[in-house]
Amino acid sequence: MAKEQKAFECIRMVERQDKPRTSGLTYARDLGMGLRSLEAELESSAEFIDILKLTSFVPRIQSKKLISDKIKLCRKYDVEVGLGGALLEIALLQGPQTVKAFLGEVRDFGITHLEVCRQAVIMPLPHLLELIALVKDMGILPLAEVGVAYGITADEEIYVDDAKLVGTMKKCMEAGAWKVLLESEGLTESRHKKDYRCDVVSKVANAFNLDDVMFEADDRDVYTRYITQYGPEVNLFVDYTRITHLECTRRGGWGKHPVINRVATFYGFGKGKKR
């Protein structure tokens, strides 16, 4: 879609890459919105959303027409569509033929990105890697979701093997993952703030080109921290209700005090905003 002139252009703000972006991606969770709600969200925020995620079990209880219409609407606003890993995990438990039928329907819908994970299922790593390669071969971009915990409470203690975590993420990339998504549960989600495992996030960030990693960061203090530590072009996965605040934080115009008037980007001399 053609870009419209912004209001108050006399006020400078941090530049961001134009779509299609190679970094600073925003992956937004859709919680089952209808068409009118989705269009209202896209009308105000589509420029800041790179991929809309159809999440959890929700697409299974919605009509095929609604899902198809939502995908068409996203395309109209230059937003790609991804699908969370829950349905794929259920398909895995129901056998190879269900997996085959499910992946075929994902492709037929025109869904471009699919989370591949083993959050709920117990599956050997080589099988996960084979699944990533299969999804890629079907022309779907596999987003390998990797985490340290699933279904915990804030008061539960967990053991984090960060070397194993980083190793798994690297193997997922080698198998053909488009990017790896670091699940927040056990790191910042379901943790008291004093127990955040930002040390683990830091080890992941240091082990990868940041363009290859997506960080789940639903809470404002978490994504503000990531922007402060890794810059405004870090890839982030948030709820769609966070989009406007997140984009303002990326541009240094909103957010907690560490970000205000401190955020900057640099794309070289006279090269524009694409790279």
Regions found by a protein language model. Name each.
Residues 4-15, 203-275:
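C-terminal alpha-helical cap/extension of soluble enzyme domains
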Residues 41-45, 74, 105-106, 135, ...:
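Generic structural signal for hydrophobic
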Residues 21-37, 55-60, 82-98, 121, ...:
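Active-site mouth loops of central-metabolism enzymes
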Residues 97-102, 163-173, 219-232:
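Catalytic cores of alpha/beta
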Residues 23-29, 49-54, 79-85, 114-116, ...:
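Hydrophobic faces of well-ordered beta-strands that scaffold small-molecule active sites
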Residues 12-15, 36, 60-73, 91-100, ...:
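Active-site-adjacent beta->alpha loops and helix N-cap segments on the catalytic face
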Residues 1-69:
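Conserved N-terminal beta1-alpha1 strand-loop-helix module at the mouth
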Residues 113-189:
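Conserved anion-binding
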